[in-house]
């Protein structure tokens, strides 16, 4: 079984959507490290005098041979209208941009803190958006691909899909 950090009881996870994903990731075999609600702080650009920006990856999955995978989880029933994402009547940030931004912020931090001895070209990395509550049949934006998107239909096999 995968190791979780922090190791929490699923019922203590505030958002049901993240709880569902946390439970599904419990099916990952040993060797995986799953970081939940992983915060990061980075300069806006790679300049030291730039303002800092904060972010949080819903899940970061690490494996010594398979690399790094960032999961962005969106509950409810997100839908794309034109070029804008909505959850109900409320506009929301593009989940695919969020996942990508989280991944690159983490990769930048790893490179920086390792003094460039660990470079992103040395391991596989990616990001995936998960809609655990809904079966999404709408269009996907051009900045993504169906292979990096999972909805409620994939939840029962989520761990197996990630382990592939």
Where are these regions (language model features)?
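Intrinsically disordered, low-complexity Ser/Thr/Pro/Gly-rich regulatory segments
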Residues: 1-164
